[in-house]
């Protein structure tokens, strides 16, 4: 559905060239939800502007829904954009128009008959859960409702690809989850390919099939979400994974415990998939002559399974402690002894 081959984007400035996107190659499958994550300045927004043709790449090929976006202009580009739609962080609604009129706006521009515009708008209002708000104005809506209008408007022309540029960044956590649930539902119902740009790993964890991590204009890591959670290779990726797998203030807590612990081992257990549901601690206490203290932990769900991190302190005879660690690894649970934070 989407293929980027050796794509680069260089902006000229009075201080020299700015390499916003550097040699990015990605392949996004039809019907999947693909996440692109990175901190501010990583090149995410520049990349999404290349996908919808708002910018031309300095080099490389951008193909979306069978069209090489970098090679078309004018009418050809406008036609290609009918297959690509977008929602934004700040909604970009027309404040003088009602919910229904906002949704009908792209159809109006496309020259669709009024009766068909109204029919399509009503279908979309039902799809995004805004029944009863048809005649409301944006100023009368909550942030989540405004984004639902934005999603409905983006779907008006039956696009094949939906680009989401930090679409939940301006929302509270509960509303964020409701919007992500809606996007996941739309993906399943319509088979829509969704590309999510975000700096929040929670968004990736909740609904994405695959993820690419960007830093300084480059894709530094890419893969299935659960695989990336399980084995993050780059330091940047590890920091993102820690956002959702470790409780806040983990570093300070562990350092305090390390300083106060005279014996035993502090161990981080990493669970993936079915291993997250094993009664591991019970078996350790039952089968070995050690004491086990649970320090803190967290389990998160991805679309492909559970991922969890648990910090424990194991105390006892050195040989018996090592036996416990081998036992843990035999259970397909990663065990890492923490010596410093």
Swiss-Prot record:
Keyword Membrane among UniProt keywords: yes
Binding site for ATP: 38-45
Catalytic activity: L-methionine(out) + ATP + H2O = L-methionine(in) + ADP + phosphate + H(+); D-methionine(out) + ATP + H2O = D-methionine(in) + ADP + phosphate + H(+)
Gene3D superfamilies assigned to the protein according to its UniProt record, in alphabetical order: 3.30.70.260, P-loop containing nucleotide triphosphate hydrolases
Quaternary organization: The complex is composed of two ATP-binding proteins (MetN), two transmembrane proteins (MetP) and a solute-binding protein (MetQ).
GO molecular function (one): ATP hydrolysis activity
Identification of the protein by name: Methionine import ATP-binding protein MetN
GO cellular component, one term: plasma membrane
């Amino acid at each position: 559905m989407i293929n980027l081959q050796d794509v680069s984007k260089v902006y000229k400035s009075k201080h020299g060239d700015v390499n916003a996107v550097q040699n990015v190659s990605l392949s996004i499958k039809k019907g999947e939800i693909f996440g692109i994550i990175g901190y501010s300045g990583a090149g995410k927004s520049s990349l999404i502007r290349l996908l919808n043709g708002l910018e031309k790449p300095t080099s490389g090929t951008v193909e979306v829904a069978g069209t090489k976006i970098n090679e078309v202009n004018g009418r050809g580009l406008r036609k290609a954009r009918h297959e690509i739609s977008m929602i934004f962080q700040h909604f970009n609604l027309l404040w003088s128009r009602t919910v229904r009129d906002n949704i009908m706006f792209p159809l109006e521009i496309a020259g669709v008959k009024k009766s068909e515009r109204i029919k399509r708008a009503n279908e979309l209002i039902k799809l995004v859960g805004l029944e009863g708000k048809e005649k409301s104005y944006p100023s009368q809506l909550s942030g989540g409702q405004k984004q639902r209008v934005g999603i409905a408007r983006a779907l008006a022309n039956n696009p094949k690809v939906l680009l989401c540029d930090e679409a939940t960044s301006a929302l509270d956590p509960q509303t964020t989850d409701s919007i992500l649930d809606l996007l996941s539902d739309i993906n399943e119902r319509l088979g829509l390919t969704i590309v999510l740009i975000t700096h929040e790993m929670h968004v990736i964890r909740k609904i994405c099939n695959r993820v690419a991590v960007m830093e300084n204009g480059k894709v530094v890591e890419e893969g299935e979400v659960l695989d990336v959670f399980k084995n993050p290779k780059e330091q940047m990726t590890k920091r993102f994974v820690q956002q959702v797998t470790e409780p806040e203030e983990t570093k300070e807590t562990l350092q305090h415990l390390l300083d106060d612990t005279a014996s035993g081992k502090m161990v981080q257990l990493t669970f993936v998939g079915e291993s997250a549901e094993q009664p591991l601690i019970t078996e350790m206490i039952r089968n070995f002559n050690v004491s086990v203290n649970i320090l803190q932990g967290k389990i998160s769900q991805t679309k492909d399974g559970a991922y969890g991190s648990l910090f424990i302190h194991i105390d006892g005879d050195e040989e018996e402690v090592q036996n416990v660690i081998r036992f843990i690894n035999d259970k397909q649970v990663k065990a890492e002894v923490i010596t410093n934070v």
